[in-house]
């Protein structure tokens, strides 16, 4: 038994059957320099050449420092890339806790508290040799002599203070840096020194319940617990209530339902409606809380129809039955129409084709809950859109000449058409409001057998009169 350390490597006779290649185990480079083969695991404390100062051992020391600096640089880059993946808002949330957080002394000074989270200090002579994988990396990359550098690194770390287990990711107790090098390589750098007490102290004030689930993100420099109960998982209706506190929750719920549950779309609709109310419609109601919304949302194809009184056609859905044409919108400063400022006033259009109650207001009771005012903005909007729809159909029919319908004399048909009648007196227009408040359905203006013929006759007569 020679005195070169234990365990030993005995070279036996060649085996007849070839064996499978074994995984390479790291050897002590200092012992190899002196002609001895020793396994590196559990050997560095007992190596007889750990204090040798020959040329080869000095070269191993210098190479060890270079490799330690490289490993420290890689670890720092890995930490920075991990921090860049986590958004800034998540780093300061109270639910985030590092795996090493909360293990140090709570009564430590602030500088010690900043150094409490240390992910395997990358000091040139301390951190890399404590990991077995760093040793293997050194052995595999640099060959035989660099294996000695890894062993030398482990010797320099653990010889004055005793052997330690492999502690790549185990947190060290908080200690103040002895020299500026260690402070420079420690985790809380200049940009992280302000964020760390924020991420560390709140869990003490607000302890996380054990039932709360969290996801663990592991990296080269450590791991971070991210809770599932982040603010981003809040229901969309709650987010809308926070962003638009002036609106009623039923209004927000209807708009969100009309957008198909899309939170971003609902926010865009609300913002666009707010800007449109402030700029294009100064006569509209400035307080959206005063709008009375139906309790059920199936009255309209798009819920925005029950939201704002006089709005641009961009807010109406494309397939809506009550869509207002872009060219026939009401404008507040238009000379063609006079809009009454009282809540009972219905906009009367001085158009060539005055409108009658072709579409009675059948939905008024379901739209309004207060019987004080018979007309609210939703009723006015519904009346406007249906009247404009009819006017739009008549105008569009007047633009085309049908080659299949015979020409008729325009005078009699034009006067007999109830839609194209001359302007009614003022009393008839005022009585329109009282007449439309009834709940029963009104008889149609046309009988079923005359409806198609009367419409085609009126269209042809308008074409003849326009050409004459």
From Swiss-Prot:
Q: Where along the sequence lies the DNA-binding region? A: 28-75
The DMA domain is annotated at: 234-269
Which residue stretches does the UniProt record annotate as biased composition, category Basic and acidic residues?
191-203
The residue ranges flagged as biased composition, category Polar residues, are 157-169
Q: Name one GO molecular function term.
A: metal ion binding
Q: Its GO biological process terms? A: male sex differentiation
Q: Mainly resides where?
A: nucleus
Q: Name one GO cellular component term.
A: nucleus
Q: Which PANTHER family does the entry mention?
A: DOUBLESEX AND MAB-3 RELATED TRANSCRIPTION FACTOR DMRT, DOUBLESEX- AND MAB-3-RELATED TRANSCRIPTION FACTOR 3
Family that this chain belongs to: Belongs to the DMRT family.
Role summary: Probable transcription factor that plays a role in configuring the spinal circuits controlling motion in vertebrates. Involved in neuronal specification within specific subdivision of spinal cord neurons and in the development of a coordinated locomotor network controlling movements. May regulate transcription.
Q: What is this protein called?
A: Doublesex- and mab-3-related transcription factor 3
Identify the species of origin. Answer: Takifugu rubripes (Japanese pufferfish)
Q: Which gene encodes it?
A: dmrt3
């Amino acid at each position: 038994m020679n005195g070169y350390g234990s365990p030993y490597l005995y070279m036996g006779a060649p085996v007849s059957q070839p064996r499978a290649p074994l995984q390479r185990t790291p050897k002590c480079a200092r012992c190899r320099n002196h002609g001895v083969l020793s396994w590196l695991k559990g050997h560095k404390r007992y190596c007889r050449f750990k204090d040798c100062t020959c040329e080869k051992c000095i070269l191993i020391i210098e190479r060890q420092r270079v490799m330690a600096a490289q490993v420290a640089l890689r670890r720092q880059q890995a930490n920075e890339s991990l921090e860049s993946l986590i958004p800034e808002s998540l780093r300061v949330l109270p639910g985030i806790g590092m795996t090493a957080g909360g293990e140090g002394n709570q009564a430590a000074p602030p500088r010690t508290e900043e150094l409490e989270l240390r992910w395997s200090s990358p000091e040139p002579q301390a951190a890399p040799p404590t990991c077995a994988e760093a040793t293997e990396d050194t052995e595999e990359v640099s060959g035989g002599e660099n294996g000695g550098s890894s062993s030398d690194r482990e010797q320099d770390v653990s010889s004055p203070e005793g052997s330690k287990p492999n502690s790549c990711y185990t947190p060290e107790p908080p200690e103040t840096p002895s020299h500026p090098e260690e402070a420079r390589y420690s985790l809380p750098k200049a940009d992280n020194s302000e964020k760390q007490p924020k991420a560390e102290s709140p869990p003490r004030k607000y302890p996380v319940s054990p039932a709360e689930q969290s996801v663990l993100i592991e990296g080269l420099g450590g791991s971070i617990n991210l809770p599932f109960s982040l603010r981003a998982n809040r229901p969309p209706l709650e987010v809308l209530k926070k962003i638009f506190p002036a609106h009623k929750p039923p209004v927000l719920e209807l708009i969100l339902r009309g957008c198909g549950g899309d939170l971003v779309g609902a926010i865009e609709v609300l913002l666009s409606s707010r800007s449109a109310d402030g700029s294009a419609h100064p006569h509209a109601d400035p307080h959206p809380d005063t709008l009375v919304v139906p309790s059920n949302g199936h009255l309209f194809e798009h819920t925005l129809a029950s939201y704002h009184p006089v709005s641009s056609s961009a807010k109406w859905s494309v397939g809506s039955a009550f869509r207002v044409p872009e060219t026939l919108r009401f404008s507040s400063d238009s000379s063609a129409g006079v809009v009454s400022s009282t809540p009972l006033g219905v906009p009367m259009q001085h158009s060539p084709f005055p409108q009658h109650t072709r579409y009675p207001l059948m939905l008024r009771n379901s739209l309004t809950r207060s019987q004080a005012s018979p007309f609210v903005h939703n009723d006015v909007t519904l009346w406007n859109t249906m009247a404009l729809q009819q006017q739009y159909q008549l105008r569009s029919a007047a633009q085309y000449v049908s080659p299949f319908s015979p020409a008729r004399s325009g005078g009699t048909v034009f006067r007999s058409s109830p839609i194209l009648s001359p302007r009614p007196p003022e009393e008839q227009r005022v009585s329109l409001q009282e007449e439309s408040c009834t709940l029963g359905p009104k008889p149609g203006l046309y009988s079923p057998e005359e409806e198609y013929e009367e419409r085609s006759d009126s269209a042809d007569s308008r074409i003849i009169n326009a050409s004459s």
